[in-house]
């Protein structure tokens, strides 16, 4: 097991051959660094309500329902291709999106969105799963031309991640078919 402080370090380690692969959410930075992304599963966005009235739904909700509330992203919304597209679509539908947690301090109803990979085994009585565009693609990142052993390992991971998703993430995730 190799430890990296951030995605930049992971990219460097992949390019230098210090590591063979990494499990990540798809982002533009992967291709920009000359790395390859192999999708495995669709990973949904989890919404964590703050100071919301009891009628704010829990469980699975569509984007059209979620845009009625103030949003904030747990990280930078541009961290993944999916969150960038989600940000643009929510803005198009006139969602109120804030860039920080100040609304929580003022006790205004807000929903914090975070990729499910960062919120394992969500309790759907307390949070919601955003149903929009299947979710972000989660998969395996390698250098552009991995060796045959790594390629076979990637194929096995692509097959196993959907089967193990409920055990790993607390919810059944849909495989990415390509």
Predicted regions and their residues:
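Central regulatory/effector-binding core of bacterial HTH transcription factors
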Residues: 1-29
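Short beta-strand-to-loop elements that line the ligand-binding cleft
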Residues: 1-6, 73, 91-103
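Short, hydrophobic alpha-helical packing/hinge segments within bilobed ligand-binding/sensory domains
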Residues: 9-13, 19, 98-109
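Short beta-strand and adjacent tight-turn residues that come in two discontinuous sequence segments
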Residues: 19-26, 100, 111-116
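Flexible hinge/capping segments at coil-to-helix
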Residues: 36-71, 151
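Secondary-structure junction motif
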Residues: 63-93, 168-170
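C-terminal effector-binding regulatory domain of bacterial HTH transcription factors
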Residues: 82, 133-134, 138-178
